[in-house]
Amino acid sequence: AGYVTPGSYEDPVMEYFAVRNQAGVYDISPLIKYRISGRESEAYLDRLQLRSMAKLKPGRVTYTAWCDQYGRVIDDGTVFRLARNDFRLCCQERMLPWLLDSAIGFDVSVSEETAEIAGLSLQGPVAFAILEQLGLAALATMKPFDIRSFELGNVPMLISRTGFTGDLGYEIWVTP
């Protein structure tokens, strides 16, 4: 993928307690990101993964798993509904050939956007306070699994109230 990331910085125990008691930052740019759009994108995604996309409203994110034609799990990750017929999938494994093969017969466009989207995950009980000090107080009204557009220092970004720690957290997505 072209990324090199450390397993930990300094002391993993210290990192754990920082995330549980204050906040920690993770570079999530290496996650594989796909854009799926088109008139039949909802039906297409319903065929590939376990959640009903009709229930996922624009501006929301859901956690799900992708399955092959036999129902075996291929990978898990998140689906962002950016607009009515516009989605982003974030996952660990590359699967563009499978996504393209699965798109045959659907009026959809599937493309990888991993290199075009960078991400940082800010997790922990003081994550909001940190972002509020940066001028992002409007995050206070976000519910878990919301995603919204913001601008900070003339830099447009999407911020989702998501994360993998089980605590308060945000993922910040920008075009580098």
Residue ranges and their predicted role:
Residues 1-176:
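Glycine/proline-enriched, intrinsically flexible loops and inter-domain linkers
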